[in-house]
Amino acid sequence: MTERAEGASKAPRSERVTLPSLVASPEDLDPGLILRVAAGDRLQLAPALLAEVQRRCEAAREVLRHGGPVYGVNTGMGALAGVRLSEAEQLAHQRNLLLARASGGPPWLDAADARALIAVRLRTFLSGDSGVSGALCQRLAELLGQGIVPAIPRAAAGCAGEITPLAHAFGPLAGIGRVLGPPGGEPEPHERAGDAQLAAAPAQPGAGTMPAAEALRSRGLAEFALGPREGHALLAGVPGATALALRRLADARALESVMEAAAALSIAAAGAARDPYAAAGARGDAVMAGVLGRLRAAIGDDPEPRALQAPVSFRVVGPVLGHVLRACDTLESAVGRALSGVTDSPAFLDGRFLGTAGFHGIDLGAHCDQLTAALAHAAEVATARVHRLLDARVTGLPAQLAPRPGPDTGLVTVHKRAAGEVHALRRLAVPASIGLIETSGGQEDVQSFAWESAEALRGALRHAHVVTACELLTAFQACSISQRPAPAGCRPMLRRLAEIIAPIEADRPFGEDIEAVLSEGLRSWPWPFRPGAG
């Protein structure tokens, strides 16, 4: 539960002080709280929970003192797993694990993604499966509270698991590597060169970095001394793919809602027959029934449709967006399994260390790929609707929605922008979780590439947002010049768009309108029929 300082509810939003959220059990650090931590919330770990984590840690260390070889603790890793380490080597081994494995580079995850990753890692540690200390869990919470955000590479993991990005994520605990710096921090080489890939990613204010050791000193924190197995535990599992999938899932659900709104405006503008949106057509499919119900609430009835059948892209809105929502649901289930399941290897279970396959994130990767494909299809269908809205035969409106067809070009290049975005999105829809590459001398001969699947989903969302903005702009213009009265359920959306888009009375650079819809219209969208809204 999130507590607020006394009187904070009466203060302006910018002045409110939020107290840390109390975590009394691993389950308290649920997806909703992880998203709030990503946005900046702090955590307070209950003393009883830390005591239980420490009890499990002591039991694990007792097994280590008297047991045989344990992978990554008293042995090497990967192809060197057969090498036993001396007691002296074991003392330095856990810190060393975070050194050479940090082979990634920029562009970095933004601060929210990085904070979500730390929160997921903390959630898995609080289960006790890792055998780490309560002090390590407390330090992770302190890093979140102090705003120390590691510089974690976005791409090129190439691991069975996530060892490379996790080495970057948790090296700063021990003063290794770099963290995202304040505005004016040291720029990265690609930043100085104007790297296009960074420009396409969400910008981090003053996106430079600073040495982790310097950041710790500036906050009065010592470098954390890793105990037995703690370096290896920090590199285990799939906390990155879990965090990225959770963040993209929230983005996808929000976007799907706006896609419904854009489709509703297009249906109204085209005067499409309403039969495909009838409740009877969704028998046996509760998800599609929800989509169709929200569409009906927006578009109402049309006693005089322009044609017996509208083009297919208008008729299939229910199945297309229902599939997007189902893909969100299945990805949400995969995230839940990753948060509650065993992802450590070896994991400390039933009083012994047990090698597991918890690092293999195919469940997350495959479902990220599925959602990317669903978004690609939805964007393709939306782009087809944009094209049809420019066609006077479909709408009865001036060709290309131009104020003066011929002297004015109209919105034809808005459709071409959408077509270009869809072309880029299709390339991202190739499943990232397929394609194995042997590493570590064949010891790691399989990867799931779940991290890459989550990154592909991020790109897909970016392109799908632009396509949706193109449809909103086109449908707005069509509704604006149509003699048909707008359905009552669509009027709040049209009023909102009218606040953003000036009347189109002649050709102009429509890219500016698309950017305005992206930056303003999609941020606070008045779609009153959101899923779950009643």
Regions found by a protein language model. Give the residues of each.
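FAD-binding core of FAD-dependent oxidoreductases
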Residues: 71-93, 100-125, 151-175, 194, ...
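Intrinsically disordered, low-complexity proline-rich regions
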Residues: 1-18, 159, 186-205
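Acidic, glycine-rich active-site loops and adjacent beta-strand->loop/helix elements
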Residues: 77, 123-124, 144, 156-161, ...
